[in-house]
A protein has these predicted regions:
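C-terminal helical "tail/cap" subdomain of flavin- and related membrane-associated enzymes
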Residues: 49-145
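FAD/FMN-dependent oxidoreductases across multiple families
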Residues: 1-47, 53, 59-63
C-alpha cells in the first residue's frame, strides 16, 4: 500500500526513523517513491550513524534527518497533493480538457510535471511555452476548484 495523502506529520521518534512510503515520501501523482526511498534512506543512514556514534539516538538527534528531507521535497509533495486533489473530482469532460493541455507538453516538461517539479523557473518556462495551461489554472483558482 502506497500512501497518497501527502507527507507524514512526523518521521522520527526515539530510536526510529521512517523512510520511503512509511514517511509519505511518494509522489501522489504517480504513486512512485523509490527515488525518494533510496535518496532519503542514505540520509537516514548517515544521521543514524552519527547518532549511534554519539550514543544518543533520541528524537532530537534524529530530527536532522526530518529537517533535511522535508527541506528537499516537502513543497514538491504538497504541490502534487494539490494537483491530485483537484484531479480526483474531475468529470470526464474536465479530464478531456486537462489531457488536451497535458498532451501539449514536451517529454521533458511532462516528466517534470509527473515528478512534481513545480519550481519557479519551471513554472515560468511552462507559462511562456503553454499560456493555455496558465489560463486554465487561473480559471480554476477563480472558480475555486
Amino acid at each position: 500500500l502506497i500512501p497518497n495523502e501527502g507527507l507524514s506529520r512526523k518521521t522520527v521518534y526515539n530510536n526510529v526513523i521512517l523512510v520511503g512510503d512509511s514517511a509519505g515520501q511518494a509522489n501522489p501523482l504517480v504513486l512512485e517513491g523509490i527515488r525518494y526511498a533510496i535518496r532519503f534512506g542514505e540520509v537516514a543512514g548517515r544521521v543514524a550513524a552519527v547518532a549511534i556514534r554519539s550514543d544518543n539516538v533520541n528524537e532530537t538527534t534524529l530530527m536532522a534527518y526530518e529537517k533535511e528531507w522535508k527541506k528537499a521535497i516537502e513543497s514538491k509533495i504538497n504541490s502534487a497533493v494539490k494537483v491530485q486533489n483537484r484531479w480526483v473530482g474531475l468529470s470526464d469532460e474536465e479530464w478531456d480538457k486537462e489531457l488536451s493541455i497535458i498532451e501539449e507538453l514536451t517529454a521533458d516538461e511532462f516528466l517534470d510535471f509527473i515528478r512534481a517539479d513545480f519550481g519557479v523557473s519551471k513554472m515560468v518556462k511552462l507559462a511562456t511555452h503553454h499560456p493555455k495551461m496558465i489560463v486554465r489554472q487561473l480559471f480554476n483558482m477563480v472558480k475555486g476548484t
